Curated annotation (Swiss-Prot):
This is UPF0102 protein VP0448. CDD domains: PoNe_Nuclease. Transmembrane segments: none annotated. Belongs to the UPF0102 family. It comes from Vibrio parahaemolyticus serotype O3:K6 (strain RIMD 2210633). Pfam families: UPF0102.
Length: 121
């Protein structure tokens, strides 16, 4: 598989995404939140909104962009996992939240922040 494991590479790009969002003024809350439904890479707060972030990386876009890697099944898992996180915070019905994607290309030189990338509908 190469010098680094898939998890190590994922951690590297999640760190890059985390730093990017912090530079944009978002407040970091949690990372790699895991439930039986799935995992959320990053959780931030922007003003009064909780932001659940899926980080995707692609070396190139020959087979589609990083953002296109978020499948319907992955979206459902993210939504269920976010609902668990919100219920544990006791804020599920009282706070706004959204799902964003950070799409990273070209070894981190190209970072695309897609807000409201995933909807519950």
């Amino acid at each position: 598989m190469g010098l680094f494991s898939k998890r190590q590479i994922g951690n590297q790009y999640e760190t890059l995404a985390k730093q990017y969002l912090q530079r944009q003024g978002l407040r970091f809350l949690d990372q790699n939140y895991l439930t039986k439904f799935g995992e959320i890479d990053l959780i931030f707060q922007q003003d009064e909104t909780i932001v659940f972030v899926e980080v995707k990386y692609r070396k190139n876009d020959h087979f589609g962009s990083a953002a296109e890697m978020v499948t319907n099944a992955k979206m459902r898992k993210l939504i269920k996992t976010a609902q668990v996180w919100l219920s544990q915070q006791r804020t599920m019905n009282t706070i706004d939240y959204r799902f964003d994607v950070i799409a990273i290309h070209d070894s981190g030189r190209d970072i695309n922040w897609i807000q409201n990338a995933i909807s519950e509908g």
